[in-house]
A protein has these predicted regions:
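Helix-biased detector of long, well-ordered alpha-helical tracts
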Residues: 2-187
Length: 187
């Protein structure tokens, strides 16, 4: 696997340096995950609270006149993935929730796997300060970028153990089961 990130900016719009990275790795034998592999009955797990990065960027870029103690959720994900893989290989989807946040990731997976998604809104972890800012600005935290969060879909009988493992990792203390994959309204 090779992945990377690029930025596109108009001439004269950049006043500093962009640092980008490329990651290379391999998928372990016996592991088969992807956006097309979500299955009805899978639990939907998020590795932590949502919307913090997007909220942080909005507050830094725009002059809303709002002061809030919100920090980005930027975090390395490799150790979290490794911990989950050491718990079980019975995983169907692992996706970062960067662009468009958890909501967009769930929409894309539903479309790619031709399944439905049922969320329990009360189970989605959102930091109080992010809730407050989103409430004032009329934003939905599920659709704000997350730079250190993943969405995992796995069989329901594995979900509690996965969440228990995640909560032992330094960047996923607020991991939670937030819903399930269904056959209702596929795609």
């Amino acid at each position: 696997i090779v992945s990377g990130d690029t930025k596109v900016a108009g001439k004269g719009q950049v006043d500093g340096v962009f640092i980008t990275t490329t990651g290379m790795g391999q998928i372990e034998d016996g592991v088969n995950v992807g956006g097309t592999l979500a299955q009805p009955g899978d639990a939907i797990i998020v590795t932590g609270d949502v919307g913090r990065h997007g909220c942080t960027i909005l507050l830094a870029r725009e002059d809303f006149g709002i002061e809030a103690d919100v920090t980005s959720d930027c975090a390395p994900l490799w150790n979290t993935v490794e911990a989950v893989m050491n718990t079980t290989h019975d995983l169907h989807v692992i996706r970062d929730a960067t662009r468009g946040g958890v909501g967009t990731v769930l929409y894309e997976i539903a479309e790619q796997s031709n399944v439905g998604i049922r969320l329990d809104a009360a189970s989605v972890p959102v930091a109080p300060e992010v809730k407050g800012v989103c409430g004032m600005l009329g934003l939905e935290p599920l659709y704000l970028a997350c730079e250190g969060r993943m969405v995992i879909m796995a069989p329901k009988d594995k979900a509690d153990k996965i969440v228990e493992t995640l909560r032992q990792c330094p960047y996923s203390k607020d991991a939670a089961i937030i819903g399930e994959v269904t056959t209702d309204q596929p795609g």
